[in-house]
């Protein structure tokens, strides 16, 4: 190997090495494009890598795209500090790519794409590269970060691919492993991209590259690059034509991470390319399989009288408290003397109050009293395991799928109070045993005089009168022993449950909400809302047409395209509710949404049920919230803070720690909406990452969030968790872009009011 020969001057060295450096540094972006980049360390990916994709964006070339009109190889070198900053950024990227290579991940070799039919096409994997190449790359990164190796005197805002280039000697030959040979782009294209961002017009200076002769140990079939001279012409149009969609998208994010607000215009011109929306369709002749998940039969419920008086309900909670205390004492005794299952066994909760026996007690009590207590349990059941302890989550999941039903005597009394002694004469047939039980009522099948099949929801007695006391009693009992974790926002859950239950107990209000939703989705072929039967509905009984189906969370075994369809429609519905209609059904309990059959045509539909928790949102609130989401979509942290203060998330007096945590949480939630290609929820970790920020926000928050946020974010969380449960792929970014493109700010006078 030839000895190192230092260059005659920094400028001369930079001119000589421009081509290899462009090639070399280039592949960082490709190595991170798509889904494979997400498997690398999150900190490097979100911090160093988002900056390295700009290849020295610390110089901010995009902020003043016409600032430089000199030839590509300017005789003026950047300042030492500027060059050092760029060197550190590039070094971070090289280090990241070295780690990719060590795992056998190369540009385009991992991840998958989604076809319009929902088919996932996986790329081939390769074996890890030789360790000495990785070591050389790491050493190069170290030298660059310390300024030992200089960079070219111009910014590298576009870097499309990175090979295994190693600068060990200024005259060394570049070795290329066979598996990377096809990944090296033409140097002319790289120069064109650089010139486009710099705003330089006219032909690029000729660049000659001399052969390099370095041979690394362990690398065979190396390719020798022959000397070549490239001439390129730079167009004045945006550089989007020479970038892939993913590269341009990633480039914009990186520019904004260093507060460059002009990147989007520089890349796309005045018109940004519209993201292509993946709209999966159900397979031809698809039939809804009702054998699994059909809720039109009760398999886990028992008949039991509902405690109708406050004293009776209080006594039930008192029995639960004593039972939990005794169960916890017995569990501690068993653990102390090593009786039964060992604590170390998988699935055994550490908290003795969450023993198996106590779990049975909680489920039995909530299923018996129903009402507010059961509602709170159902709300908690849809939370993520990073927020609610798994053992408690299992308890509430059992609660969500189970509820005792009223004896026939109580059912008849409720129907008599609503429609008089001759209530049965209004039906051709009424099934005394319910086919579904919910938190505040149970549902019976019936047939009208005209032959229509209907569902009759009958409210449990005493529920409306005992809302506040039921919730207080349940929270008091379960708070013993520290069952609820800190930072779970229990107060928020309780507040929402109180308000929603008082609204849900008014079936006349729910009927109005149901009719309004039928109007809103009238032209939407994929969604259906059952018709309300007014003459057989009251404040405590609600009758609607009967629709057969199964809850969406019971569709986990459906084909991928069906799961994508369900999750996609659910998220699209949520976006329309808040931004288009400003009227939302805020209870994301998955049992309220069916994959069902149209009652007349039998065609598959996403069926919406239970509108008791429906509410409207003011235009001013939605306008500001839209600005926050769009700022997250754009990666604009300054705007997120500005609009968060305006809406009431922040006061303006928070510490930088609180502001950073808040912005980070918004950016995390906005990741799905910021992606211009389908988002794979199978690998999402949004809730886990936000959970890590909660302690900081709890400690430093100066004001509670706006009242509207609690119900809105609960619905959004339900959408995300459903998509994750179904392991679906959804074009969240494309759907949001469509909504935002047609959104009109300012009062429009069309607020919906059902109260």
From Swiss-Prot:
Binding annotation for ATP: 435-443, 457
InterPro entries on file: ABC1_dom, ADCK3_dom, Atypical_kinase_ADCK, Kinase-like_dom_sf
One BP annotation, GO: ubiquinone biosynthetic process
Location(s) in or outside the cell: Mitochondrion
Main location: mitochondrion
Source organism superkingdom: Eukaryota
Active site: 587
Protein name as catalogued: Atypical kinase coq-8, mitochondrial
Protein's gene: coq-8
